Structures are given as structure tokens and as C-alpha cells.
Amino acid sequence: MKITMQIKLQPTKEETVLLDFTMQEYISLVNDILDYAIASDIMPKLTSKTMIAPLPSALKAQCYMDAKSIYGNTLKHKSRMPVLKKPVAIWNNQNYTIDDGYVAFPLFVNNKTTKTKISAVVPQRVLDIAATHKLGTLRITKKGNKYIAQIAYETAESAAKTSGNVMGVDLGIKCPAVAVTNNGKTKFYGNGRQNKQKRRKFAAKRKRLGKAKKLKAIKKSHNKEQRWMADQDHKISRAIVNDAIANDVKTIKLEELSGIRQSARTSRKNNHSLHSWSFYRLAKFIEYKAGLAGIEVVYVNPAYTSQICPCCGKRNHANDRNYVCSCGYHTHRDRLGAVNILTA
């Protein structure tokens, strides 16, 4: 399984100029190679010597590989040839090093290639991974005014468990996730009300900024909200998988992603929250973390999971947060969904 870790760079003012220049020249060279390939209807054979650009040879070679990959994929899928715009530069794993406090890679300085150490926040976890795993490419990108180093590495998934318990997980708005295991354990994850209040603050701030026509500030606020949402999903998915491991779970059952928005229970005032929160992202976070632990993830049909009584099969509508069936069964409505997913 391929995983990408991120490192926040802390370049000096002079180094930010170098990074901006390098990233712009990188995408310009890739676009130039693609333009040539389109015009001649064939991918040209180029070397770092024949590619004219103020970039280190390693970066030129990577530019050619990227252009070749884009050109081949575009022909294969018969799609429109893209034009790269987002600043980025990529180094292969032989041309960079990571150490405590910095990331070093070649840059073109004063008309010559110089391996440059850029100050960075490098967590111990990243150093441990670098020492024990084969690293892939280094990708430098810019998000707002921040420079991020993205490093890919391969890790083996744990062998799939052949025996163990089953966990059903229901995703929602008021309660982000509820998990029920076949050994009788139930747990609620996240705080939907707190999430809603937090996102209302983001929306109110953007409304004020909109009236002041501060477009850059609006975009910054939106990006900050998205990062916060992703962080919440990471924490919830980690907690779910940790509990699955603790309960010897071999299979986690989730709702099919295509129907989750239709089946989710919500009021009109929660419609915005429903359609802006990414159930897909949370499900995928659970899936990849579970895969690393050797836990299988299965998707089930979500139809009527919030209405069917697991005891008698009768369909009922919950009253507020309580679900009561005429057969005598009663439970929390969010837990009901997880129970029905578990037994689906």
C-alpha cells in the first residue's frame, strides 16, 4: 500500500524565491514537452542535456518522465491533454535526503546545481519511516504561503484475519459514527453538534469577508475548514480502527458510499451539513487504516437501515433520537443503523 506523508518546510526568504522559481520552471518544462509531443504527434526522445531549462539534471529527467506519463495516459483514455498550472516540483528518491530539522535536495543556484538544505518540521515518526521503509518521490508544492514536502512510501498490509468479530459502522451528521460489534460492544464517535457549531463559525466569517470583498481571505478560511474536517475524519477513523483491533474484529461493515447521502437521517436545517461533509473521505480513511491492520472492509446496502427493527423486521420511524418497535425492541436511532449494517 502506498502512503504519503507530509512535512512542513520553513524556507528563508531567499529560499522561497528559489522554490517558487524551481516549481514554475518545472511545470513550464513539462508543458513545453507536452506541446512538442502534441505538435509532432509523438513523444520526443530527450535527455537532460537536450532539455533547455534552468533546472538540475535530476529535475529535468523527472520532468520528462512526468510528461511521458501524462502523454501516454491521455492517449490511452482519449482525453484532453492537460495544462499544468499548480506550482510543483518532483525529485526521485536518489536525489533528496531527510534528517532531523531539514530536507535537502538539488536546486539551481547561481547557474549551478547545489544540494540545498531547507529547514523543516520533521517529526520523529517520519525519521523512523525513512529509516525502515523504501521512500518514493519527493513532491514539493505550495498551499497558500506554505511550502509542503510530500513523500511517498510503500508499506505492506497486515495479513487478512481469518477469524474474529464483525463490526458495523453507521455514519451520520448528528453523530459522525456509531460502531456496534457482534460481541455486544457499542461506541459513539465524534460530536456532531460541536462540528456544526464550528462550521457555522467558518461560514459566518466567510459571510463577513464576502461583504468586505476579501476574496483571498475567504479562500484561506475555506481551506482551513477543509483541513479541520479532514483532521476530524482522521481522528474518528483512527479511533474506530483502534477499537476494532482491541475487539479482535476481522471485518468492518460500512454503508455503500453511493447511497449514504440518501439514507442519512437529517432535517432541512442540516441539509447543508449533509452535502458538505465528506462521508466518502471518512469511509476511505477507515478503509485504508483497516487495511494496514489486516481488517477487511465490506460495503453493504444502506436501504432502510435506520427504520427496520432487527428483532422482527418491521419498518418504523424513530421519534427524535429514540427508536421504539411494537415488538418491544428499543434503542438509540443512530445505534440502530449500525446494528442493521452489522447484520446485513
List the predicted regions and their residue ranges.
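Nucleic-acid substrate recognition interfaces
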Residues: 1-344
